[in-house]
């Protein structure tokens, strides 16, 4: 038996992300499943606002050479099929969506950007990376009296759940 990594996140979009598409062949067991219940979460949509000078300061903390003159210099270059940002350009720098999420402490990399000259708004859907088990949907399944095995099999079909006895180190 092989132990698999089973990632989780708080709230996603209408579907979880596809592990094979995102991370490669070794994560083919992380398939995209319906998480439409996430839309009912109070944390499904979040607006995060930054003045241009604050945005610049936050990025410069990690990238000293970062320059941006106008909020209009922020452009999403690539998203996955669910809308998670894969690549975004800001000023003189390109970033991965997850990297931008970490730099700005955004709830999710599933976002759109709206700007005027001095203000930037990130309209984010979900909380977390969207890969694996949605805690919100899993919680709703539990409220419907689904057992943990059924919940795990829904998010990770094809994986076998086994009991493992842990030995104490003496």
Task: Annotate each PLM feature.
Residues 1-170:
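Conserved, single-site charged/polar hotspot
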